[in-house]
Amino acid sequence: MSATRAKKVKMATKSCPECDQQVPVACKSCPCGYIFISRKLLNAKHPEKAPSSTENKHEAKRRRTERVRREKINSTVNKDLENRKRSRSNSHSDHIRRGRGRPKSASAKKHEEEREKQEKEIDIYANLSDEKAFVFSVALAEINRKIINQRLIL
């Protein structure tokens, strides 16, 4: 049955201008010898002579423009701005940097706190009068005596 039923497939064809024969569109030449010129070849520009020397090759490549550098104007305003920028950058470096992530050890933190306390420690009793100092020393002596007596009992 399949032999009797032949499928007719309609192909896209083009006719040869010399022999008027129908040739498939994909063919670039006709059996009679005629060569079909593709539209790409018609529209394409013919390449000029290829540069033979290395200098011409470098010229053929696209040139990149150089970066434009601004000239600095020597004025007091610009100097002031530069000084401000420098002072700001220095002030940021003075701050204590907090490290990100897990702390390495707790002892390092304690050492930092002790240093800060020593730096911030101010003598409160410097402006204290002699009478007040005597009253406080008597009170401290009584407190110390009571604590020592408690230790002896235990």
From Swiss-Prot:
<keyword id="KW-0175">Coiled coil</keyword>
<feature type="region of interest" description="Disordered">
    <location>
        <begin position="46"/>
        <end position="119"/>
    </location>
</feature>
<feature type="coiled-coil region">
    <location>
        <begin position="104"/>
        <end position="132"/>
    </location>
</feature>
<dbReference type="InterPro" id="IPR018886">
    <property type="entry name" value="UPF0547"/>
</dbReference>
<dbReference type="InterPro" id="IPR040246">
    <property type="entry name" value="C16orf87-like"/>
</dbReference>
<dbReference type="Pfam" id="PF10571">
    <property type="entry name" value="UPF0547"/>
</dbReference>
<keyword id="KW-0597">Phosphoprotein</keyword>
<feature type="compositionally biased region" description="Basic and acidic residues">
    <location>
        <begin position="68"/>
        <end position="84"/>
    </location>
</feature>
<protein>
    <recommendedName>
        <fullName>UPF0547 protein C16orf87 homolog</fullName>
    </recommendedName>
</protein>
<comment type="similarity">
    <text>Belongs to the UPF0547 family.</text>
</comment>
<feature type="modified residue" description="Phosphoserine">
    <location>
        <position position="91"/>
    </location>
</feature>
<feature type="compositionally biased region" description="Basic and acidic residues">
    <location>
        <begin position="109"/>
        <end position="119"/>
    </location>
</feature>
